[in-house]
Amino acid sequence: MKARTILAAMAAVLMTSAAANAAQVAALVGNDTIAWVDTVQKKATGMTKVTGISGALVGIDVRPADGMLYGLVEDGTVVTIAQDGKATMKSKLDTMVAKGLTVTVDFNPAADRLRVIGSDGMNLRANVDDGKVTKDGDLKFAETDMHKGEKPNVVGGAYINSVKGAKETALYDIDGTIGGLLKQAPPNDGILSAVGKLGIKADKVAFDIWSDGNGKNDAWLMAGDTLYSVDLATGKATEAAKISGVSGIVRDIAILPGM
């Protein structure tokens, strides 16, 4: 076997192994449909319409505190979503991002609060148990960042160490205009620093981070039917798999636990 062939085979094995870490993924397709994606088989094993909601879902995430899949509706209603698609209301946020914007949602595993970010820069922190929302600092690039003065366009975001009982975490975002990975630190202040370019178009992408609970974090991005791994140190996105059975705009993804 030629050296080039060996290297290609090794790369394929490594990418297959990496995709396996993502395990089962819930992908929000359109306004109200969940595609259940098996990253090992590289296909959607089912498409489920979410019932019991009034309006469009704008984001989904797994809450580390209870392992359940949550969804946020455009009017601020927070629901849990069962495997059969049935939505059960948890609360209604007292403050919500304006309709028509791209919304990013992800649970802070250390604080057990839902981060809600609008593509206009609004930066919210919500208690999903009672719906109370704290409006944090609007997003802006750090004074020392190369993008200082530019308007952020965050279209995805996720925390590392996303497991129950996490003591430390950090928030990473995707900017659709720059096409790059950002770090939001501190998250409550909304200060953004560029990590690096993804190398792909990023205006319509979904983003989440898988954590093993021992410090390992693998970032994943889905654009249409393509799943990418994202290097949190450089921002580079690398194609991991083409997922069959997924059609339409994937608005968000949530990596499911224990699958």
Locations of regions flagged by a protein language model:
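An edge-strand/N-cap motif at the start of beta-rich repeat modules
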Residues: 22-40
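Conserved beta-propeller blade signature
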Residues: 24-28, 68-71, 113-116, 166, ...
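Loop/turn residues immediately N-terminal
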Residues: 31-35, 67, 74-79, 120-123, ...
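Short loop/turn segments that connect beta-strands within beta-propeller blades
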Residues: 39-42, 82-86, 127-131, 185-188, ...
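A short beta-strand motif characteristic of beta-propeller blades
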Residues: 43-52, 85-96, 135-147, 190-199, ...
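Structural signature of eukaryotic scaffold interfaces centered on beta-propeller domains
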Residues: 58-67, 96-112, 148-167, 202-215, ...
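Blade-level signature of beta-propeller repeat domains, shared across WD40, Kelch, NHL, RCC1
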Residues: 232, 237-259
